[in-house]
Amino acid sequence: MTYIALVDDEPNILTSVSLALETEGFQVDTFNNGEEAIKGLETKKYDLGLFDIKMPKMDGNELLKKVRSSTNVELRNMPIIFLTSKDQEQDEIIGLRMGASDYIKKPFSQ
């Protein structure tokens, strides 16, 4: 079983993306912001993180920094893909330089 942490503050995104992934056989846990996510990421092993960037409390960039600086080697090395409405090329470059594995711009299709 592949475990995915999906982090987004938009309920519609959480519902539609998690449903699509679960239909394909993935186990998905959802979090509404980075603050919630870091607690979950520190207590359970995930194979992949899908993070929005623009969120309240702790945004995706800050969450990525915390994950990449974690003392937990598995967490620190977890692949992370940004799913974001930030569509400027510079945003993508910054995200990848910060340590994101990939960058997908919203809206996206299955």
Language model: regions and residue ranges:
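Active-site beta3 strand of CheY-like receiver
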Residues: 45-50
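Two-component/phosphorelay signaling modules centered on CheY-like receiver
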Residues: 11-29
